[in-house]
Each structure stands twice: as structure tokens, then as C-alpha cells.
Amino acid sequence: VAWLHAFLASLADLGFPSPRPLPAFGGQSWTVAEGLLWEIVSFIPGHQVGWDAEPPMVQIGALLARYHGAARRIQVSSQRPGVIPLADVPAILLSPKLDLACPDPDRAAVIRRLAGRLAADLEDRGHRTAARLVIHGDFTNHNVIADGKPPAATGVIDFHRAHLETPLADIAYGLWRSGRPRQDAGCLDLPLLQQFVRGYASTAPPLPGAASALPVYLYGRGLQMIAKRVLEGQPGSGMLAQAEWTAANAAEITDAVATALR
């Protein structure tokens, strides 16, 4: 939490609309009491966008680009402790630990196949040497705040998955949920995805290779969530269906992103 609050303080100092840590505990913004972690940050007025149709995805994509612009100006000296960077996911899912969290051999075989593909795809795209910044880590519409009439995307909350990663991964992690047509869908709404990408591109400098890389980071997000459960020793591979769909439709997603960026 010290890593995160230091970053959030720097982000707020740059004027980005995000929670600012408040020194309410003897000069600190967090403390441990009775075995529990307590933290306090400032309030961002407005309401959670969630599944609302407004503000449009173009605005939300542009807000993420604004965040990345601010994050590039903040230097951090180390990775956030306790996170699972995407580059670490294949090794976790190809280890014997997977069998404990996923006792179904057929599902485990699918996960291992996708994990091997992820390792190859990341290597092909030079992921390990790509430029990094502190990504939000969960930039879904449920963590975007809207205010005004008509509603406009005005702020971002819940940075608890923030860590060093490539900015393209942040786009994909947000679209993993908010790019679906509805919460229980196991697929993406490509026109919705295109709106988000257009909004991002309207504000951010070009991201080389975005069209072909975005599907990789999308199905990688699903595998990352499975890897987290594997390390925790918990069963759970419910996100596998969407990861499979995304990997199977990578060409269509690439075409949709390329069209949006023209």
C-alpha cells in the first residue's frame, strides 16, 4: 500500500482526477490496526459508469489515454510487490500447481495450450522489453466516475491493481469486462471495443503494433486471472470461456482495432 499511495499522491499532484491519499493516521494515509489495513483517500464526486450507455466509450478511452499521459511523467523505482505481471503468467499455468486449482484434466489441457500460446505471442511482440508505466490495472467502466448532464467521464477510482506494465495491456484489461455486451457474456462487442480504441487514439500518441497485440493482452488477462487463483490454491477457471473466444477470434479483433485506428 505504501507503493500505491506514493504513486497516487504523485498522480494527484499532476492534476489527474483520481483519489489523493489523505494523511489522517498520524501523518500517514494508511495504518494497520487489530490486524486490519486501513487507508483513506479523497472522494471523487459523481457516479460509477458501470453498464450505463453514457458517457460513451469514446470518452472513457480518451480518459485512459489521459491517465497514461500522466503516468508516464511519474517514475517508480520498482515493481509493485505482490502482483502477477503478464510475463509471469505462462510459467504459473504450465506448472503442476494448475492441477490443484483445476482438477478437470480437459480444462487444464486447454489452459496449458493457451498458456503456451501466450508465451509465444508475448515473445513475438517483444513484450519483456516494451516500455512500461504504472497502469491502472482494472480500467473498467465500473472504476470510471461520471458526472454532469449529460454524464461525462470525469474521474477514475480503485487503483488496487495498479502495477508496472505496458500501456496496451491496460487497454485490454479494461475491455476484458467493459468490452462485453453484458456482464455474463463470454465474448466481446467489437463495435464497443472500436469506440474505446478510437477515444484512446484521439488523445494518446500512436502505439505501434496495437492492432495485433491487443487480442494477446485480452486473452492474457483471462489467463492472468486464472493464474492468480492457481497461486492462491483456489479453484476457478470461469473466465476460460472468454479467453478461448478471444484467442479464437484474434484475427477479427485485430481487424476491428486496425479499422478503428485508421
Predicted regions located by residue number:
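ATP-binding pocket architecture of kinase catalytic cores
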Residues: 1-78
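Long, hydrophobic, amphipathic alpha-helical segments used as structural scaffolds
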Residues: 71-78, 126, 208, 233-234
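All-alpha amphipathic helical-bundle segments outside canonical DNA-binding/catalytic cores
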Residues: 206-218
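A cross-family kinase active-site recognition segment
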Residues: 25, 51-109, 130-132
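ATP/Mg2+ or Mg2+-diphosphate-binding catalytic cores
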Residues: 97, 225-262
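Short amphipathic alpha-helical signal-transduction/dimerization elements
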Residues: 62-72, 119, 176-179, 258
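Active-site activation/catalytic loop segments of kinase-like enzymes and analogous catalytic loops
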Residues: 168-204, 219-237
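Active-site acidic catalytic loop and adjacent metal/ATP-binding pocket
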Residues: 21, 119-169
